[in-house]
């Protein structure tokens, strides 16, 4: 093989090996880490009635609004029931909620959530009657109706015992809401579009602005850790501009954080969590108190009385074999977890240890307790 060809092949192999060994950067698309100004959902809410329940509806004593609503609805249908006794066991008053998607067109459908308002036991098999859904401005944007799907199962026996799986007092209607009014938001004539970072950070904001300016010079500026102001270049409308920039790749950054759920015993921490040099010792102390009541029997013919004498036994056990663990300065997440696992700690013990390390000033991260 000629020397020049050998040198070329060797150079190519070395370059390929470097590319394979190089760690991949955790980059994300801009549209996955920001929200566009005005492009958001709006919450809708309404009050309605579910009928067709199998005796699991509201009672007249605890839910008088159900009877009033039923009477008003029947009167609108031309039925006079003011002087008659109504049974609401097959009817339930409910609150209906939905999210109005951005740019939703009139006639499109959305899912709605139905939740009981009174003391109804279940919405299984019920049908929601026509219900208007209003926005925060009081305007009606959608109308909902349909069969409620609860996703729950109930079973009972003749003795009165029953088993319920799921939540039967709340359900959904897939495509049960029809959009009647549009929000009227338009992007075509906008001059400036502000991008809002979902996780505010100075570094990420600058990187987003740099990525946009690399493709469209002078069209983006980071105003603060949350907002990046953008302007389309001359001759380009806002829709085309957003289409071009939303798929640009950016490596997001953020402060080191440890999230703790004390109820479930869950700990979530990022790879950028660092810890200063610190020594950790952990031991479990178990205290057992056992009651052993004894009977005191008097001697014969002594005119004494039999009595119960309480006797308590207290045992204190401390787990042996635990060592003092020393973590060097700024170890990685792998080293931190490996060191804590070396102590044999459980996730719940690890929560207390991390909080103690943070209190000692050795944990270089924020702790967020859920």
Curated annotation (Swiss-Prot):
One of its GO terms (cellular component) is bacterial-type flagellum basal body, distal rod, P ring. Its main location: periplasm. Pfam families: FlgI (PF02119). GO terms for molecular function: structural molecule activity. It is found in: Periplasm; Bacterial flagellum basal body. The gene is flgI. HAMAP family: FlgI. Residues 1-26 form the signal peptide. This is Flagellar P-ring protein. The keyword Signal applies. Keywords: Bacterial flagellum, Periplasm, Signal. The basal body constitutes a major portion of the flagellar organelle and consists of five rings (E,L,P,S, and M) mounted on a central rod. InterPro entries: Flag_FlgI. PANTHER family: FLAGELLAR P-RING PERIPLASMIC PROTEIN FLGI, FLAGELLAR P-RING PROTEIN.
